[in-house]
Amino acid sequence: MVVIIAMKCVCIKPNNSFHIGECGYGIEQTGIFPHSDTIFSGICNCYAYIKGRDALENLIEKFFENPPFLISSALPMIFLNNNNIFFLPKPKVAPGNLDYELGKMFKSGEHISFSAFKKVTESSLRATIKDLKLLSKCIVTSDEYNLIKDKDFDYIKCDHKARNAIGRLTSKSSIYYCGISAFPKNWGFYFLFKGEDAWLKNIEPSLKLLSDEGLGGERSIGYGRFKFDIKEIDVPTAEDSVLMTLS
C-alpha cells in the first residue's frame, strides 16, 4: 500500500557544473548528486558566516538530543514548467508485480519517478512494459515519457577537466585532472526537508548565500552555483516490510 506524505523540498537548478569529490585512482572522481552531509556542511558554513559561530554551535547542540530538522541526500529531478518530475532511488529489490520484460528493464534503471514508484508498489496491480518506460537511466510512466521524449533530453554527464597547479617554491606548473558533473538545461536535483517551517525559514538565508558561494568543490573557479526554490510536494511511501533510505 502506498501512502502519500506532504513534505517540503528544496529544488535546485544548477547554474553550471558541480564537483562532488569522491575517491579516484590518479584522478579525483566526482559524484553526480551531493549527499546529505555535504549539503548540511554547506548550510552550516553559511549559517556561521551570517549569524556567527556561537549561533552555529547552539544549532548543532540541538541535533544531539532532538534534531530540529532533517534533510535527505540530493535526488534528481526534471524541470518541465508546471509538470516537474521528481525521482527516487530505484528499489534494490524489484517488486513482485512486474512482468518479465518490465523486470529486465527495471534492472537497467538507477532512479524511478514518484508516479512510477507508486505504480510498481501497488501490489494489487501487475505492471507491464506498456505502463513504464526507461529514459536514459530513469524509469518513468508512459505519460511522463510522452512529456519528455520530444524535448532535448540528455542525462547528467560526468567528465574530467584539466587544471593547472603552480608550485609555491619552484613556480613550476603541473597538470592535474578533476571530475565534474554537467547538468543539461532540464535537469536539476532536490532534497527533502523534514521539520517545522520556522526552521526552514531560519536556514533560508544560508541557502541563499550557499547558492552564490557554491556547493561542493572547485568553487573558486565558479563550480557549484545554483538557483533554488522551496516547494511542498507529495512523496509516495510504501507501507511494507522493507525500507528505502534517502540519506
Predicted segment positions?
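Conserved active-site/ligand-binding neighborhood in enzyme cores
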Residues: 1-247
